[in-house]
């Protein structure tokens, strides 16, 4: 019976209404203690729109944010930041699906590029970082280490025609020890 009493008190504190943020953006939806809390929609002064969950006046939980320029994020939020699993649709038709940390692509994720290229791997502050595989639309691929959005460390570049390089990379260039294997069966070690 105590549980029912707590639920009733909580249910009575939720109201449906409007809230204007200090920047002039307007929220409509569930309000608790005078702030957005629960499901609602915010229309921002710049034309952006967010529909989803709020907690204590901040985007928190699942939501969809549509930018005025046509970009869109669908996913998890934590204290007004993209945080957790989400999908971002870029205006140039790239699409990222993966983990976010404080508004950055961070952790495991996949980027589908507008030209048909695909990257599957780790991200750090919106840059490819750590281990990942980049597959070009023409069939070539790179499987290896990344740093600051560039091939860096050990990796294998396969041209998709029987030629491949296995070795060290530095800032997107072959650097250090490596082996070039030709489609003819020849091999160059250097």
Q: Which residues does each PLM region occupy?
A:
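Bacterial N-terminal signal peptides
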Residues: 1-5
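Intrinsic low-complexity/disordered segments
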Residues: 7-9
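TPR/Sel1-like alpha-solenoid repeat signature
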Residues: 43, 66, 88-89, 108-112, ...
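One face of beta-strands
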Residues: 15-17, 40, 63, 86, ...
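Conserved anchor residues at repeat-unit boundaries in beta-strand-based tandem repeats, strongest
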Residues: 26-37, 49-60, 72-83, 95-106, ...
